[in-house]
Amino acid sequence: MTTPVHGFVLGKFMPPHAGHMYLCDFAAGLCDQLTILVCSLEREPIPGKLRHEWMSALYPDARVLHFDRDVPQEPSESPDFWDIWRELVRSVHPEPIHRVFASEDYGLRLAQELGAEFWPADPERACRLVSGTQIRQAPM
């Protein structure tokens, strides 16, 4: 019997867009169990609870979790940034994570911190040139 491959994606999903869906679809196709962690801060313009609901509806076969503690968002914000995020992820996902999927540079370091493989998904944005910031600035 083979061990199921656990995949992991995290993001703000503010709002979920085609790039996020590409990433999650890519990840879902390369693991047996996918966990999506929706991270939010109280001060953000779209409530985290709503984003969690959206991602849960989009990915009913994934385990979609929500984390809403105020923690550093960039390594420059805290010398303990990677320790904080490693423990945060382990607190919500105590099972081993085998693969971390991301389109951003942080994915490699996060995978290393978790003892997982890094699987980059379209890092050059060749498949989906989408920005959540641009969507929030001009939603229609």
Q: Predicted regions: what is each one?
A:
Residues 1-140:
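Nucleotidyltransferase catalytic core that binds NTPs
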